[in-house]
Amino acid sequence: MNPQYKLHTFSDGTTNETQLQSIYDLNQANTPEVGSLESMNHLKQLIELSAYNLLVLDDDEVIGFIICMRESSGYGSENYKFFTQRLKKFLYVDRIAIDEQHRKAGLGQAIYENIFVEARNNDLPIALE
């Protein structure tokens, strides 16, 4: 991963409106690979439910993100429910997106490596589609 890129954890209340809009826009640009969000409010609700998230920043520009849930979040996704019926605890990768102009730069790998460390440190299996 290019050293100019920075990974930052984020949660409800730690992102500004510009970053939230960038996350939303990046999400929508990556549908159908990630589920479409109905609105910014929908994104904010996901972040409220989430347990561990990362932003990839190039200076202050959001160029990637991942949103992850724990087993107790109450998330309504059918894919998430599949894992709640099979695992007692887990870290669920709900969505990950990288800006098209920044792909093939190791960003996805860096994000997943960070998620693997978080899961290992908390003795959690990772659940994803």
Would you name each region that the model predicts?
Residues 1-41, 57-63:
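Short amphipathic alpha-helix that is part of the acyltransferase structural core
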Residues 100-103, 127-129:
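Conserved beta-strand-loop-alpha-helix junction that forms the acyl-donor binding cleft
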